[in-house]
């Protein structure tokens, strides 16, 4: 299993360090890998890895709130507290993202997904409700971490 883990990490870091396309979901998943490896003080995490992770986060972060209703990753998709090592990289977009969230919470007190399934069916409506719950819990945890709400 260790060898498989190293192979996966090597593949992820090869993409991270390259100039190949590395989209928002790829970057978010690699960021989660880097975060976990940092927690165990892995020698796989080098300054070059951290620098490339910063580059990918910035490449995939939208700072224009006019686009937030579209399918874009915001600063708070990559940073969930001010203790994140990537906080300084995106901090200039944090408050505007909070403002957007508060301006766009719906009458039920939850947030709608910024995407659609392209169909209207019982299943798509149920999945949409599930996503509302996921988004709301995730955002509530972030708001709590930034002392923007009280529990």
Protein language model features and the residues they cover:
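Preference for long, amphipathic alpha-helical scaffolds in soluble/luminal domains
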Residues: 1-151
């Amino acid at each position: 299993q260790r060898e498989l883990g190293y192979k996966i990490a090597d593949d992820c870091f090869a993409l991270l360090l390259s100039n190949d396309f590395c989209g928002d979901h790829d970057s978010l998943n690699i960021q989660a890998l880097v975060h976990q490896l940092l927690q165990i003080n892995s020698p796989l995490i080098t300054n070059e890895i951290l620098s490339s992770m910063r580059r990918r986060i910035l490449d995939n972060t939208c700072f224009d709130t006019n686009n937030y209703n579209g399918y874009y990753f915001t600063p708070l998709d990559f940073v969930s507290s001010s203790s994140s090592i990537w906080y300084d990289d995106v901090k200039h977009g944090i408050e505007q993202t909070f403002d957007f969230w508060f301006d766009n919470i719906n009458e039920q007190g939850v947030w709608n997904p910024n995407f659609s399934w392209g169909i209207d069916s019982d299943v798509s409506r149920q999945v949409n409700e599930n996503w509302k719950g996921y988004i709301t819990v995730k955002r509530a945890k972030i708001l709590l971490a930034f002392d923007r709400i009280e529990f």
